[in-house]
Amino acid sequence: MADINHDGPKADGSQMRERPSAKPLHLYNSEDAKKKVLELNQEEEDNKHEEKRKTFGRTPDGTVFIVPQTHDMVSQLLSPSQPKNLSDLAILAVLASLIFTLYICPTSARKPVFAAIFLFWRAAYNAGIGWLLEGQSKHNRLVLWAKNSHIFENPETGNNPHPTIYKLIKREMETKIPKDYKFEEAPLEYNTWLVFRRVVDLILMCDFVSYCLFAIACFNRPPESWLLFGLRWTTGIVLFIFNVFVKLDAHRVVKDFAWYCYHVLFISIVAHAAQFAFLTLVEEPHIQKIYNPPPPRRMRQNSEKFNPEDRPATAHSDATYTDTGVIYDSVRQPAPMHHIVGLQNTDFHRSIDVTVVLLCFYMFCLATVTPNTIAVRLFLFVHAFVWRLWYALGLGYILDRQSKKKNWTRHFIKHGDTKEEAWRQWKSLYHLSMTMCHASFGAAVWKMYELPSDWFLGLTLLRHVLGAGLLLLQLWTSTSIYDSLGEFGWFCGDFFFDPPSSNLTYSGIYRFLNNPERVLGLAGVWGLALITWNPPIFYLAATAHILNLAFLQFVERPHMQRLYGRKLRAESGVSKTLRQAMPSPVRNWQSAADDYVNSTVEFIEDLLEHARPKLAAGYETIVKDTTALFKTYPARISITRVPQDLAGLDPKQYKLEIEGTPSAPTVEIQKHGGREGELARTPATRTSEFKTLTFEYGAPIRVRWQAPVNHHKKDWIGLYMVTDNQSREVTRISSNGRWVATNKGVYDSTRAEDGILVSDRLVSVNSDEDEGGDCYTGEVEFRGDKLWWTTGVFEFRYHHGGKHHVMALSQAFEIRIARFDEDDVEVDANGTVHRAVEQALLPVIQNCFDRDPEIAPSTPEESFGSLVERDGKFAKRVVFAVHQMFGIEFAPEVVQADGNARNLAWRICNAKKILAPYSMSASRGRNTPTSR
């Protein structure tokens, strides 16, 4: 971003020590700006009273500025002490029109009218604002729009085509922020945010007011007892006050009903679902991107010699080891190679998965086929109760002994197995127990549930709605826990291995709650109890909850304290926020109550510790379900008709030339493998200098373009498979993000400019094919997500004016991966091809990791970057390449688990040796395995 004040101070050493004035301070880079902001904010906190303190912020380009004080939207609109501007009056007018609509609307039409109005504003909030924020998060779209439209530039420069709008926005913003703010000097990003905020204020206020008006429209007085009436109104008012608190404190919308009406309830559920989708699809990915970036690459010491003990541990390691490699420390977290949890990880080649599916099928048959008699109900109740006891007490006892004496691991080592085998067997046992615990409970619920004859009798419908909501809450909680902990934490891995880090990271749901499974983890159990409304099911739910609390208190909590000590967080994020909002007397009373409860718990712990030899007690662990995967949405360019502004443009003046990393010579040789007829076995004779272009898989490709001087600034170049387009004049398929603009600053997306190297360089053209004159040339680079990660024949297409009319085609080129031929490489000192596999694999892995120095290894023993574990696309690229090169298919988790090229090369050699007896080639092994 260009400097806002060109005459301002320059970023030298002295400037870093000076305090900036109200004008922004332009530093060289973001890191210098970050240090400067921390320094200035700390100085303000140390030397000034709270009312006189100023807050300093920074922009991505390194601009440091004073962040003016702003107020929440309710105070801005309704507080008489806050200055009002035209936008405030407009928002108040819209709110008044909503109230007036309720007044004049007929009673019979109020419900549908205000339901539609509320759903409109809710869609504007979750879909509209969500779309804007997603574009800003991924493509910086709002800031680019402001920059390209020049809407915030001073009209005196002659660049602003809308001086009236500029003056209006300037007056609005400076009226609203009278102190520490000047519109002309504020960074572009801050001014863009201020305008965006006014739009958000309008939508949020209309969303809230229209909801309240809809609730008023649905107001009624059902026939009920005064006790139920008072309880209902008290609960509703408390929830409403809490909603206002959350709205003012955190600017979020949490709405619940204060009147007994299913219309309000159902529309509240729709609103909550929309809000949840907004948080999941828009807010959470942005939070992870900004505040939880991948940690720096794990570095290891290089060594020249590698011991056999360092090889990756597998079930076949002792029998089939062929070479050496550096792997993980045996005392640390094991490599997660084949996950168990979730339907997407079900593998019927694994005995535990077959066992779980068969047992679940038996439970389904037991619940649906057997007669609904008292004896069958009693059997299913006892069956579910026994599984719950085993799941809580049995597994709890095993974990307690493992925590204190490592009994589980010692048992397997005693019989000649490894700690990795003990871990695998524990995961299978835990997974089976958890599944059967839930399946047996579900079977009991199915047998004891009776379909209501009248859904509107009493609380029947409400019970079913709340029960379904609690089920969804548990599913979401389990998914969030699994996303935060992974399978290592899901299966209590820190009971069996030292944790990867001595520091706890509170991410995902743990940012808000210390132990979400304490209450939310069993929400679905209570939901089913509400739906069935049966005493035995309530008894099972209460038993499950008590055992769960006991497990957390007496098994998990002591173990976590032994591992992390004082690093455990004493207060969750939600508790801290609510505590700060309470009055001082209430906070003091809560502290005293907490001390009393803690002392009581310690007394009970001591009592149980002395009685432990007599108690074989263990307790329940976390309840979770399948995990959900975030989807990314590639950019799309719509297919439109041929534009009308092509007159005067000659396609012959457009040209594309490509340059990439050529594939290995063996690729051309492997095309002719003796499979052809006799005449086709010799290389074809060429009558021209034309050569087939074959590039490496995943290597960046540069495209040099030429266009006339009057070419459209929104021209763009896309990458396509040759077979995907029938027409050579118009492209009729979307690029799916594989495109680069020819010029900067014409698209409201940073992704469009990613890859531009040179734009509109004026050159003279004098050749036999082109008439004399000038033209523009440029150069773009396709790499990473803008490439096709498969093999095939491709081409680049130059398109006109943001549309899909083709002006030029590049030469078609092929992406191929050379097969690794063991007969053409030299063996190492140990008589293996491990080193040759490493050398062949390393450049392929570097290409698969976008040649990014933060994640791509420079040597075979260097670890992959942390982003490889977070984003599965990198491992999938490597898996595809390995399959093409060596004919061996791995799961992506194997690449993530191995962690470097040397381990992966060892695994490839090991797999080839294991599979050699099954090869149909005589040179690779026997056709049928034989015993000696």
From Swiss-Prot:
Residues 1-88, 134-198, 247-261, 377, 450-454, 540-932 are lumenal. Residues 110-112, 220-225, 283-355, 399-428, 476-518 are cytoplasmic. One of its GO terms (molecular function) is phosphatidylethanolamine N-methyltransferase activity. The keyword Cell membrane does not apply. Pfam families: PEMT. GO terms for biological process: methylation; phosphatidylcholine biosynthetic process. One of its GO terms (cellular component) is perinuclear endoplasmic reticulum. It is an enzyme of class 2 (transferase). Residues 1-21, 29-38, 301-313 have a biased composition (Basic and acidic residues). Residues 1-61, 292-317 are annotated as: Disordered. It catalyses: a 1,2-diacyl-sn-glycero-3-phosphoethanolamine + S-adenosyl-L-methionine = a 1,2-diacyl-sn-glycero-3-phospho-N-methylethanolamine + S-adenosyl-L-homocysteine + H(+). It is a multi-pass membrane protein. InterPro entries: Phopholipid_MeTrfase, Phosphatid-EA_MeTrfase_fun. Pathway: Phospholipid metabolism; phosphatidylcholine biosynthesis. Its EC number is 2.1.1.17. Keywords: Endoplasmic reticulum, Lipid biosynthesis, Lipid metabolism, Membrane, Methyltransferase, Phospholipid biosynthesis, Phospholipid metabolism, S-adenosyl-L-methionine, Transferase, Transmembrane, Transmembrane helix. Belongs to the class VI-like SAM-binding methyltransferase superfamily. CHO2 family. Catalyzes the first step of the methylation pathway of phosphatidylcholine biosynthesis, the SAM-dependent methylation of phosphatidylethanolamine (PE) to phosphatidylmonomethylethanolamine (PMME). This is Phosphatidylethanolamine N-methyltransferase. The gene is CHO2.
